[in-house]
Amino acid sequence: GPLTSASAAIIEGLGPQDRLLTVNLARRNTRIAAFLPPEEAFRNVERCLRRAAEIASGQGLAFRRLVVSWVQGQADARTPHRLYRDQLGRLVDELAAALALVTEGQGQLVFCLSQTTATYYIGRRGVSLAQLELAKARAGQVILAGPEYMLERSDGVHLKPRSAVRLGALHGRAIRRVLAGAE
């Protein structure tokens, strides 16, 4: 699936001292607000961060990097542009703060997203514009893997399986480039 294809692309760029732990916190048809604190999805992320730090420590490693592959936006197609941008920025800030807690301020957050095709009204793309603006404003921390317009959807919203795998690979390659210092 998409997580496997993303992981495969990321692993190609890891060094011998690096490890990759992947966690799927997918929530189908969920608006961005459900991922913000104090909601359960964010508490799950906090638990995963603590566990990742424990696993790394148990192996004599340091947990220092959180990479988020953010594939969301269709559920927020009607969310006003500025509101979505503000919520997305808040999510990035909250994730960075949660990471800082478990890494004693030594962590690095890379937030990778792909530009959704979500539209509202005729041709209005507030979510995709907000995603682009945040990536420009926070270059290096927030990265765009690319647009999603070329991926096939089964019902206009959900990706077909083959397209989901392609999206995972798109994210994985973008993340690998950033981790290698190419961006």
Language-model features and meaning:
Residues 1-183:
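Cell-envelope and extracellular/periplasmic
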